[in-house]
């Protein structure tokens, strides 16, 4: 029955969904970029942040039926540069073509324990943690849970993802921690919690909710974010664990959270079943600038691939996490055509 219900919802979502057009300056090219989005508010807000770091104009199309969306895509006539269509397999059957990409909404990564500080950034975090004498403690009392929720977790999510963010409810968090299968680990400086993270105690423990007090820059500069990875790793090592799930990340390879986890030798281990179709609609310089600036992970035949985009003038140098099936490099020719330049497997 649950599968039938999910299928009905998927079909309904594929037939009719919210639509927007975002337009603004693409910073790499300095030219106007117009993006069509079909899906939910959270993904729309994500694309707005990724495509337009400054600001953009948002045009609501209201609820759009599948046939209307198809008409918009076919009749864009160069007025649109790019489309993102959120959904699952029904959406892919309706809208995805051979030249399109399918991006999972999230990927998850794991790291071996103990954590090895092999990168320059990881070593710098450890140095700053020692400099500021950061420490940690496990707490499960109501005042600590409420302080973490209102002053650490919630402000961090809102600052990063905006007012339409999904925020776990306080009662749900309290029940999880008080039940014993979730641990609240707080990062302290001078006797005050400046950051924290919730650890889900599964066979491969997972970092769940975390943040920095009031999302303050001064605490981040103390390596408070790094501490929410290092101290849980040390605690779990003491408990006999050999791996830690670093939690979910967005699939754009320049995403700060994903890049940070890569510092600790993250390996991508899983992905969401649902995602977004990325559909190039033009060969404009603004589209080329966006793709070169925001390479991403996509799904094909059950495997995850990094997709890097280059121009004749510039080669992509973004770091690619371990755990993917391979890396694909694409080149934009002078006339704006996208050509696959190279594909390498993870074993090469």
Where are these regions (language model features)?
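Short amphipathic alpha-helical segments and helix-helix/interface helices
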Residues: 70-74, 126, 173-174, 233, ...
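Well-ordered, non-membrane alpha-helical segments in soluble/globular domains
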Residues: 61-70, 118-123, 224-231
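A structural signal for short, well-ordered beta-strand segments and their strand-loop junctions
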Residues: 81-87, 137-138, 186, 243-247
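A conserved beta-strand-loop-helix scaffold within acyl/acetyltransferase catalytic domains
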Residues: 92-220, 234, 251, 343-344
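Short helix-terminating capping/connector loops at secondary-structure junctions
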Residues: 77, 178-180, 240
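Conserved donor-binding loop and adjoining core beta-sheet/short helix segment
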Residues: 1-101, 105-111, 188-218
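Aromatic (often tryptophan-rich) hydrophobic motifs at membrane interfaces
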Residues: 183-286
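Active-site/acyl-donor-binding loops of N-acyltransferases
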Residues: 3-13, 17-27, 40-42, 98-116, ...
């Amino acid at each position: 029955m649950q599968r039938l219900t999910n299928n009905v919802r998927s079909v309904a979502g594929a037939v009719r969904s919210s639509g927007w057009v975002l337009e603004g300056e693409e910073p790499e090219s300095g030219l106007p970029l117009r993006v069509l989005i079909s899906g939910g508010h959270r993904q729309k807000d994500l694309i707005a942040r990724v495509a337009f770091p400054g600001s953009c104009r948002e045009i609501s199309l209201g609820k759009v039926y599948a046939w209307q969306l198809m008409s918009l895509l076919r009749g864009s006539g160069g007025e649109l540069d790019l489309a993102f269509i959120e959904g699952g397999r029904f959406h892919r059957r309706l809208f995805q073509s051979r030249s399109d990409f399918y991006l999972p909404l999230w990927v998850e990564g794991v790291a071996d324990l103990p954590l090895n500080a092999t990168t320059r950034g990881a070593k710098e975090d450890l140095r700053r943690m020692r400099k500021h004498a950061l420490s940690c403690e496990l707490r499960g009392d109501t005042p600590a849970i409420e302080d973490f929720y209102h002053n650490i977790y919630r402000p961090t999510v809102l600052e990063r993802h905006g007012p339409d963010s999904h925020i776990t409810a306080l009662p749900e968090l309290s029940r999880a921690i008080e039940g014993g299968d979730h641990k609240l680990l707080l990062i302290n400086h001078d006797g005050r919690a400046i950051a924290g993270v919730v650890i889900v105690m599964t066979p491969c423990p997972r970092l769940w909710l975390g943040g920095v007090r009031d999302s303050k820059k001064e605490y981040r500069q103390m390596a408070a974010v790094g501490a929410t990875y290092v101290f849980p790793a040390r605690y779990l090592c003491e408990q006999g664990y050999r791996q830690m799930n670093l939690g979910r990340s967005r699939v754009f390879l320049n995403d700060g959270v994903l890049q940070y986890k890569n510092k600790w030798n993250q390996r991508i281990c899983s992905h969401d079943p649902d995602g977004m179709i990325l559909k190039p609609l033009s060969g404009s310089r603004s589209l080329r600038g966006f793709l070169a600036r925001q390479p991403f992970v996509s799904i094909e035949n059950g495997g995850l691939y990094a997709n890097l985009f280059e121009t004749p003038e510039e080669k992509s140098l973004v770091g690619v996490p371990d755990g993917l099936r391979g890396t694909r490099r694409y080149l934009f020719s002078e006339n704006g055509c996208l050509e696959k330049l190279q594909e390498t497997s993870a074993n090469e």
